[in-house]
Each structure stands twice: as C-alpha cells, then as structure tokens.
C-alpha cells in the first residue's frame, strides 16, 4: 500500500490539477497499490476487470501473437466502470507493453474518455539474470524509449512510473536491517561478475525469433 501512497505523491507533484475520475487496478498484483492510490487522491476505487485465473503471466509466454490473444482471454472488462470516465489504470509493472497496450485499447473500447496508466514499479530496461525468464532487453518496451514514448506506444494519455528511490524506500519500511536491493532490471547494474559476452549471448538466446527457430528444430 505504501507503493500506492508514493504513486499518489508523484501524481500530485507532476499533475496537481489531474482530472482522474476513477482508479482501476489490473488484477491482482496491483490491487493494494491501486486502493491506496485512490484513497490518497480522494477519487473512487473500482474493479473494472474480471480475471480468468487459468491464464498465466503473459510476458513470459513465448510468442507475441500468443501474448496478445491471452490478454483478452485473461481479462473480461466491465464497461460500466469505464464509460464516460477519465480512468487511471494501475499495474505492478510494464514489461513488454503487450498487456498494457491491449488493456488500454479495451478501456477505450468500453467508452473511457481518457486512459492514464500508473506502474507500481520503475521502468524495466534490462533483462533479469537471477531466475525470471524475462524477455531480451531489446524486447522490453522501456529499454530504448522515454516515458513519453512508452505512453504513446501503449496508447496511454499519460504514464507515470514509480521512482526507484520510492520503491526502495517502501521496501525498506519496517525492514531497517535490509541495506541493499537487487535492482538490475531497472539500472543494468548486476551484483555478480559477468563474462565479456554473457549479456550479448543471453540477449540473442531470449529473442522471440531465436526461440521460434529452436522450437522448429525440435519438431
């Protein structure tokens, strides 16, 4: 919930005269942040999506077309919560941008006047090396784009990311013994030594095109 409060502070600072009518989370991981964001902005909180819990995380699915189709299978939209409103959508993060773009498209189809987007995590710009099958860096939507360019790419009328400093502060709260955090996907600074060509080789191996070639070879 502290992440929601930090996002609210950032929104008030960047856009004090905002015209947000309603805050809606993209279920389920952003729900607590969205709820506190709505409280701190003093705007209504609504749940505008019904989630199909049998569809997994789209960003780790192997092919782009499969990811696009899975968004609509995963989320059913409640038009009444969007029609005629300026909506602030909240998600835990933006990885490839596939989910964000499709959800914003769905919100506008449902009649939203404007669709704003808040990410409870900072912009993800680098691949993960420590256990998460993240996309290649070149496939991360924020890897070579400004915030404004990401907003345009996903179709948002305005986009706000949590700052890394605020994220660290919220994670430290109540845990003063924790001094350091692994933040390489945001900063590109890895905590372990890497071979000269390791990142380059990993980048190539994680690209959709290379994955498709491997699957074809297995067939």
Description of each model-found segment:
Residues 1-219:
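PRPP-associated nucleotide enzymes
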């Amino acid at each position: 919930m502290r992440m929601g409060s930090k996002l609210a502070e950032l929104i008030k600072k960047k856009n004090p005269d905002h015209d947000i009518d309603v805050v809606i989370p993209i279920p389920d991981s952003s729900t607590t942040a969205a709820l506190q964001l709505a409280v701190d902005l003093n705007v209504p909180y609504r749940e505008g999506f019904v989630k199909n819990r049998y569809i997994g995380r789209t960003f780790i699915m192997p092919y782009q077309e499969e990811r696009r189709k899975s968004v609509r299978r995963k989320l059913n939209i409640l038009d009444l919560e969007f029609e005629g409103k300026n909506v602030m959508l909240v998600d835990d993060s933006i990885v490839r941008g596939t989910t964000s773009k499709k959800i914003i498209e769905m919100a506008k189809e449902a009649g939203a006047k404007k669709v704003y987007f808040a990410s409870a995590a900072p912009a993800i710009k680098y691949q993960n090396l420590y256990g998460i099958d993240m996309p290649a860096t070149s496939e991360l939507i924020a890897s070579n784009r400004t915030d404004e360019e990401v907003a345009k790419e996903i179709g948002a009328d305005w986009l706000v990311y949590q700052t890394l400093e605020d994220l660290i502060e919220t994670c430290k709260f109540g845990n003063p013994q924790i001094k350091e955090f692994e933040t390489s996907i945001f900063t590109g600074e890895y905590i372990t030594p890497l071979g000269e060509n390791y990142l380059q080789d990993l980048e190539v191996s994680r690209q959709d095109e290379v994955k498709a070639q491997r699957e074809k070879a297995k067939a």
